Amino acid sequence: MTGIGLRRIRRYSMEDTVSVRLFSDSHLYRTGSLKWTGITTASGEPTIGAWVAEMDFATAPEVADAMKGAIDDGLLGYQPTWLEPRIAGATAEFQKRRFGWDVDASQVRLVASVLPALEATIDHLVRPGVPIIVPTPAYMPFLTIPGKFDHPVIEVPSLRGTRALGRGWALDLEGIRAGLEAGAGLVILCNPWNPVGRVLREDELRALHDVVSDYDALVFSDEIHSSLVLDEQVPFVSYASLGPSFASHTVTATAASKGWNIAGLPSAQVILPDEALRERWDVFAADMRHDANVIGTLGAIAAYERGEAWQREVKDLIRSNVDLVERALADTPIDFVRPEGTYLTWWGFEGVDLGPLSPAATLRERARIAANEGRTLGADYASWARINLACAPDVASRIVEGVLGLL
């Protein structure tokens, strides 16, 4: 029974190479891609889609085959009874094989996506009304979701120019401690870090633990981009993997949605190694698994079990785009730090005279590039913009040309 919906998967060895299928502009416009048609210029002219966190690539053939097989098998109703155990096992095995984290399948819970998991954590596990700490710049919903549950947000702007990281970004641990002293009950961690592209090192995670452990607080660790580490010299380390004292205060959320470009089919996994925290979760979240999409979950299983060869090629494409941008911006006043992970990149325009418009508005109106407004990722970042580089090489070139044309 557990093979249903997966029977069409091609079997690749780790040495196999697959071809990544890139979508053309015309295809993306014709299909009404939100990324490419959701933002136009003020006069209605089309833009280059660089704002939504998805890739301009077809998903892995293994994933597509699994989803097509599920449709052929009629798996369009409610979740089959074997689905949650199967995704739990695939998630645990992937975490162990890819990152060395020895997760047991019994510690994995199926949810629709990372954001509902965050909402459930805030609503049910955090003390009512206490502040939520968000290191910034941050994924936009992290700054808005706490307010839906009557929790104020404490933004902690991150540090630049540390000795260890050069121009890279680092958590402001003293700022986080100050927020915890003020009564905060949760720290939202994003690793790899959207939008700055940092992959946090083990010593950074241990230093964060030393701060959080002094207080009655939890960590929500969003690891949705963990499979997209671009710098092969930087290992990904999950915060909760570092020991029982880490796991005891951590809700870890991950998914295949970003790494295999299936975000429109909601399916994510919460990992809870700590038994006491897992029991608290199960009291209120037992039914959350029903919100996960069956087709998306089967796609995630295929991604975790058979999708790594395809993803290696995807990361090569993204790295090539990053190389292009890094070279092009090297002698310009634009602040760009090469991402260690994720295809989302963070561009600073503080040293550029763009006139009265924000960077994102200027990019849209003058370069016809749709990017994210920096101020939506943190109050201190009005002079920044987030740009997605998971695109065809020619699109990356056009983004660079458009940006350089503003100088």
Please annotate each region the language model reported.
Residues 76-210, 227-228, 234-245, 251:
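Conserved core of the PLP fold type I
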Residues 15-113, 120, 303-306, 407:
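N-terminal small-domain helix-loop-helix segment of the aminotransferase-like
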Residues 68, 177-181, 209, 213-216, ...:
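A structural alpha-helix within SAM-dependent methyltransferase catalytic domains
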Residues 301, 318-326, 336-349, 381:
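Conserved glycine-rich beta-strand-loop-beta hairpin in the small C-terminal domain of fold type I
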Residues 149, 214-215, 246, 332, ...:
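Helix C-cap/helix->beta junction micro-motif
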Residues 244-319, 407:
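Conserved core segment of the aminotransferase class I/II
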